[in-house]
Amino acid sequence: MKSGASAASPTAKSFNFGSSRLLALAQQLRVYKPPLSSSFDEREELLAYKESTRKSITHVGFQESMAPVRFRPKKAAVLICLFEGDDGDLRVILTKRSSTLSTHSGEVSLPGGKAEEHDKDDGITATREAEEEIGLDPSLVDVVAFLEPFLSQHLLRVIPVVGILWDRKAFNPTPNPAEVEAVLDAPFEMFLKDENRRSEEFDWMGEKHLVHFFDYKTGDSDYVIWGLTARILIRAATVVYQRPPAFIEQKPNLKYSKMNQATRLYGWLKPLANLHESCENGRLLGHVPAYCLRYLVGISSR
């Protein structure tokens, strides 16, 4: 997504603008550009994938021309929908996923999902998914910024889309029971505070990462916001409030570039040469059995 945020937003005249604080925030975010150091151009990304998959796939006799498409991470987008609470604080809309879902069931997440072919940009993806999941009319959301991409554990390239809900009263949540169990909102600034927060180290793709857990209580319900959702919200709050969190987000020695991450990930496909020979049906998915891929790199079958 290289176009400006306004490309995915309705015209300003369609919104009932709220406080001067929200107006100032919208102006601030419209000029935001993700840091070059934390991402890379899609052309460079594709070249990296082509090179890394070429080295891996030639070992198992796959057609090289198919590698960039078959093994490239799919795109997704999530909506960081901000609005002004009754006390004047910024709040963000979250969902509790249905307990019947096959992945991340019952977890707190941001509205969003995978991109579809007809989606013109990441803003369309995020707002479309939000409408499908919680009944949030895209015309109510003013898309103002796109953050740098995050890679999920299921190898989705997730783009956080920041939108402003100028009139909270115009939104009547209608969760889709097949996907969402509950709709909630939380104070946005909590993701910069070292309160009701803990962290643990987890291994992922051969590296150790700090995973943050935020405990949040509203009414009679207790929620835990963690993992990728917490990472995205920490980053988004850092951008919005223009200050770092009051805790260590990631240990310096645990950081590494996304380019190295991509190269290392696809280098893991080399063991497919031996594993493929032991699989009874090597023609599933045309080339590689789906369960072999999931075993090696955790690719979701969905």
From Swiss-Prot:
<dbReference type="GO" id="GO:0046872">
    <property type="term" value="F:metal ion binding"/>
</dbReference>
<dbReference type="InterPro" id="IPR045121">
    <property type="entry name" value="CoAse"/>
</dbReference>
<keyword id="KW-0378">Hydrolase</keyword>
<dbReference type="InterPro" id="IPR015797">
    <property type="entry name" value="NUDIX_hydrolase-like_dom_sf"/>
</dbReference>
<dbReference type="InterPro" id="IPR000086">
    <property type="entry name" value="NUDIX_hydrolase_dom"/>
</dbReference>
<keyword id="KW-0479">Metal-binding</keyword>
<feature type="domain" description="Nudix hydrolase">
    <location>
        <begin position="73"/>
        <end position="229"/>
    </location>
</feature>
<dbReference type="InterPro" id="IPR030674">
    <property type="entry name" value="Nudix_hydrolase_AtNUDT22"/>
</dbReference>
<feature type="transit peptide" description="Chloroplast">
    <location>
        <begin position="1"/>
        <end position="25"/>
    </location>
</feature>
<dbReference type="GO" id="GO:0009507">
    <property type="term" value="C:chloroplast"/>
</dbReference>
<comment type="function">
    <text>Probably mediates the hydrolysis of some nucleoside diphosphate derivatives.</text>
</comment>
<feature type="short sequence motif" description="Nudix box">
    <location>
        <begin position="114"/>
        <end position="135"/>
    </location>
</feature>
<dbReference type="Pfam" id="PF00293">
    <property type="entry name" value="NUDIX"/>
</dbReference>
<keyword id="KW-0934">Plastid</keyword>
<keyword id="KW-0150">Chloroplast</keyword>
<feature type="binding site">
    <location>
        <position position="133"/>
    </location>
    <ligand>
        <name>Mg(2+)</name>
    </ligand>
</feature>
<keyword id="KW-0460">Magnesium</keyword>
<protein>
    <recommendedName>
        <fullName>Nudix hydrolase 22, chloroplastic</fullName>
        <ecNumber>3.6.1.-</ecNumber>
    </recommendedName>
</protein>
<keyword id="KW-0464">Manganese</keyword>
<comment type="similarity">
    <text>Belongs to the Nudix hydrolase family.</text>
</comment>
<dbReference type="GO" id="GO:0010945">
    <property type="term" value="F:coenzyme A diphosphatase activity"/>
</dbReference>
<feature type="binding site">
    <location>
        <position position="129"/>
    </location>
    <ligand>
        <name>Mg(2+)</name>
    </ligand>
</feature>
<keyword id="KW-0809">Transit peptide</keyword>
